[in-house]
Amino acid sequence: MSLASNMDDRNHIDFDAPATLRKWPSIKNQRASATDRPYLIVDGTLDDCIRQFMAKPMGQHQLYEIHTAPQGELVSAVLSASHIHEIVQLRDFL
């Protein structure tokens, strides 16, 4: 189910919520298998992290994730690149 199908008046994203942008160590744009967790890139708000993520090269987006407090059905504790892209598309409607 896509995020767009979950939208109603009760769904709201707090873009000022604390969040961290993290990147998985990589070799040739692929996650390095020898690591067990991503490292910190940005410690700020969800908005800060989304902006920094979108500024990264598209070919590297799969290496990044955003960690934040869950917010209903729209925002989970760990946001993958595809989830971040959906939130960016919905942002103008929220």
Give names to the regions the model predicted.
Residues P38-V42:
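Local beta-strand/beta-hairpin segments that build beta-sheet-rich folds
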Residues S2-R10:
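N-terminal, charge-rich interaction modules
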Residues M1-L3, F93-L94:
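Short, intrinsically disordered, low-complexity terminal/loop segments
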